Structure formats: structure tokens, C-alpha cells
Amino acid sequence: MTLQEQIMKALHVQPVIDPKAEIRKRVDFLKDYVKKTGAKGFVLGISGGQDSTLAGRLAQLAVEEIRNEGGNATFIAVRLPYKVQKDEDDAQLALQFIQADQSVAFDIASTVDAFSNQYENLLDESLTDFNKGNVKARIRMVTQYAIGGQKGLLVIGTDHAAEAVTGFFTKFGDGGADLLPLTGLTKRQGRALLQELGADERLYLKMPTADLLDEKPGQADETELGITYDQLDDYLEGKTVPADVAEKIEKRYTVSEHKRQVPASMFDDWWK
């Protein structure tokens, strides 16, 4: 088995999917998991990007089906901007599409800036822009878990195969969640699910960005990665990609393995 095939298997990627069937499987997963845990529903941060839009709509469909079947579950969508978000219109469009039971908004700027200032005062150095970006992601995680803990809700994560293979998420930030309904999907497969669900194409054709950097607001994921999502998707779907692209992907996969594992102990061997 080639490394490419090993990665596809590890990340549960199917080269070809049926979007309607995938929606059904993922909604059922959300329903089954919330029932098994005894939780009261879900909470998820909504950015206006493809991934949170898809996960949010799946979550809302799941809680509606639970209620229609005589159960009780709710979904809270959370806006978590840092000051004024450049693509706020997209976030509002996503909320209109998702139709969450409840939507709330937290501006994380005061918390992030207060921490950054205290860090600088105590350690006599400023956080790097990259590190501050990770603080933003982790404050967003803290906010979602505060809501979830208060109301008995599970935190949904938006990680999918194209992010997982590169480790393109913040450890214990957007990587911190209770369940991951998008696991195994490539970026283009996620788009196909949103198309099937009837989303406005603006929500899945827009340029993907983590938008965590003050110095490079709205920087494209592909710029930061040095790899396009089409290349990532082709690789993950078992297609042939240029040798240098495959090498980049496989290197990122190897060095980011710790992000896909629970914290290491001396009894684990995955890191050796």
C-alpha cells in the first residue's frame, strides 16, 4: 500500500461519493451521538465559510429530526468575530441558510487583546502574529465550550480530510471539539453536499481563509499552505498529482500527526 493509499484510508476518504447519501449518514451520526451521550444538542461557531456552513446546516437538520421524532434537542450557532469581520455579509448569509434554533454573537477582540497585552507586560515581548492568531482560535473554542457546558450541548468541529491531511487547524482551537461530522470529505465533496442542500453558491465558491492574522487579513488558505485545495482533493481522492505536490502533502501529514492524536504518553507508539 502506498503512502497515499495509507493516508486515504486513515482519513476515511472515498474517491467518489453520493452527496445525498453522505448528508443522510452525517445527519444520522449527529442524531445517534447526541442521543447516546444524553446531550441536549449542539453548538458551533459560524464564520461564513464553507465548512461551518455545511456543519451548521447538518446540525440543524439533525435537531429538527430529533424533535420530529419526539425527542428534544437544540442547535446554537455562534458568531465569533475579532472586531469587524471583512466578510460579515457572508456570515449573515450562512446564518440565513442554516436557520439555527438560536444565534448569538461574541466579539472576541477584548478578550484576545487583553491577553495579548498581559502577555507582553509579563514576558516583555509581543506575541507573533501567527501565535496571536492561534490565541483567537482558542478563545473561540473556549467560548463554544462555555456555551456547551452551560446548556448541555456538544461542540461541533469542522475538520475535514483536506484540513486533516495538512494539519491546517489550531490544536485545541478549531481542532477542539466533541464530534466531527465532516470527517472524510474533501473540499470539493463538501461543496457537493452544500449544492445538494441548496446553499447559495457564494457560500461554497468563496476563497477559503482561516483569517487569523492581523498583518495579513483574509489571507487565502492556499497561499499559506503553498498547495491548492484542488491538488489536495486530487491527492486524497487517489488521483495522480505532481511529485513535488505529493511530497509537500506527505511532509505536512507526517509533521502534523501530533495534531490528529490525543496528547502523547510514554505508552503510545504513534510518535516513534
UniProtKB/Swiss-Prot annotation:
Biological process per Gene Ontology, one example term: NAD biosynthetic process
Keywords per UniProt: ATP-binding, Ligase, Magnesium, Metal-binding, NAD, Nucleotide-binding
Residues noted as binding deamido-NAD(+) in the record, renumbered to the chain: R138, K171, D178, H258, K259
Record field: pH dependence: Optimum pH is 8.
Domain of life: Bacteria
GO cellular component labels: cytoplasm
Pfam family, one: NAD_synthase
Reaction catalyzed: deamido-NAD(+) + NH4(+) + ATP = AMP + diphosphate + NAD(+) + H(+)
UniProt keyword ATP-binding, yes or no: yes
Keyword Metal-binding attached: yes
GO MF assignments: ATP binding; glutaminase activity; metal ion binding; NAD+ synthase (glutamine-hydrolyzing) activity; NAD+ synthase activity
Pathway of action: Cofactor biosynthesis; NAD(+) biosynthesis; NAD(+) from deamido-NAD(+) (ammonia route): step 1/1
Transmembrane domains' residue ranges: none
Binding site for Mg(2+): D51, E163
Residues the record lists as binding ATP: G45, I46, S47, G48, G49, Q50, D51, S52, T158, K187, T209
EC code: 6.3.1.5
InterPro entries tied to this protein: NAD/GMP_synthase, NAD_synthase, NH(3)-dep_NAD(+)_synth, Rossmann-like_a/b/a_fold
Family: Belongs to the NAD synthetase family.
Subunit note: Homodimer.
Function: Catalyzes the ATP-dependent amidation of deamido-NAD to form NAD. Uses ammonia as a nitrogen source.
Protein name: NH(3)-dependent NAD(+) synthetase
Taxonomic source organism: Bacillus anthracis
Classification lineage: Bacteria, Bacillati, Bacillota, Bacilli, Bacillales
